[in-house]
Amino acid sequence: MLSPKRVKFRKQQRGRMRGVATRGNTIAFGQFALQAQECGWITSRQIEASRRAMTRYVKRGGKIWIRIFPDKPVTMRPAETRMGSGKGNPEFWVAVIKPGRILFEMGGEEITPEIAKEAMRLAQYKLPLKTKFICLDEQEQPAGTKAAASSTVES
C-alpha cells in the first residue's frame, strides 16, 4: 500500500476541504480518466483496492496511472481511553481529494472506451466519493486555454 517513506512531522491536523482542485484536474498521461465529483479522503487501502480491480479487468492490455498519493497521516486513540494524554498515533494514510481531481488514468493500444469505462466502474465501487468517467477528446479545457484558443480562431 502507498505511504510516504519519511515525513518531516509524524502528525497533522485534520484540516478543511474547501474549493475545487486547481492542480491535477486534467488528463496528463492516458486517454481515459476517473475524476472526483466531491471532496473527501481516500485511504491507501481504497486506492490499492481500486487499482487491483482495474488491473484485474484490463489484464495486460493497457497501462494505469495513479494520480493521487496518500500523504496525510490520520491518528487514532485506543478504544476506551480517558480524555487527555495527547494525540493518538498515526494509524493510516489518506489522500485529500477536492472536486475535479483526476484519480486514475488509463491508456494503451488495446484499451477501448468500453473496456476503460467498465474498469473505471469497478474502481468506482471501491471509492467513498462520487466520480465520473472522462475521455481525453471530450475533456473540457481550463478557462485560460479556452479563451486563448477562441481568440486565435477569430483572428
From Swiss-Prot:
<keyword id="KW-0694">RNA-binding</keyword>
<dbReference type="InterPro" id="IPR000114">
    <property type="entry name" value="Ribosomal_uL16_bact-type"/>
</dbReference>
<protein>
    <recommendedName>
        <fullName>Large ribosomal subunit protein uL16</fullName>
    </recommendedName>
</protein>
<dbReference type="GO" id="GO:0003735">
    <property type="term" value="F:structural constituent of ribosome"/>
</dbReference>
<dbReference type="GO" id="GO:0019843">
    <property type="term" value="F:rRNA binding"/>
</dbReference>
<dbReference type="InterPro" id="IPR016180">
    <property type="entry name" value="Ribosomal_uL16_dom"/>
</dbReference>
<dbReference type="Pfam" id="PF00252">
    <property type="entry name" value="Ribosomal_L16"/>
</dbReference>
<dbReference type="InterPro" id="IPR036920">
    <property type="entry name" value="Ribosomal_uL16_sf"/>
</dbReference>
<dbReference type="GO" id="GO:0006412">
    <property type="term" value="P:translation"/>
</dbReference>
<dbReference type="GO" id="GO:0000049">
    <property type="term" value="F:tRNA binding"/>
</dbReference>
<dbReference type="GO" id="GO:0005840">
    <property type="term" value="C:ribosome"/>
</dbReference>
<dbReference type="InterPro" id="IPR047873">
    <property type="entry name" value="Ribosomal_uL16"/>
</dbReference>
<dbReference type="InterPro" id="IPR020798">
    <property type="entry name" value="Ribosomal_uL16_CS"/>
</dbReference>
<keyword id="KW-0689">Ribosomal protein</keyword>
<keyword id="KW-0820">tRNA-binding</keyword>
<comment type="similarity">
    <text>Belongs to the universal ribosomal protein uL16 family.</text>
</comment>
<keyword id="KW-0699">rRNA-binding</keyword>
<dbReference type="GO" id="GO:1990904">
    <property type="term" value="C:ribonucleoprotein complex"/>
</dbReference>
<comment type="function">
    <text>Binds 23S rRNA and is also seen to make contacts with the A and possibly P site tRNAs.</text>
</comment>
<comment type="subunit">
    <text>Part of the 50S ribosomal subunit.</text>
</comment>
<keyword id="KW-0687">Ribonucleoprotein</keyword>
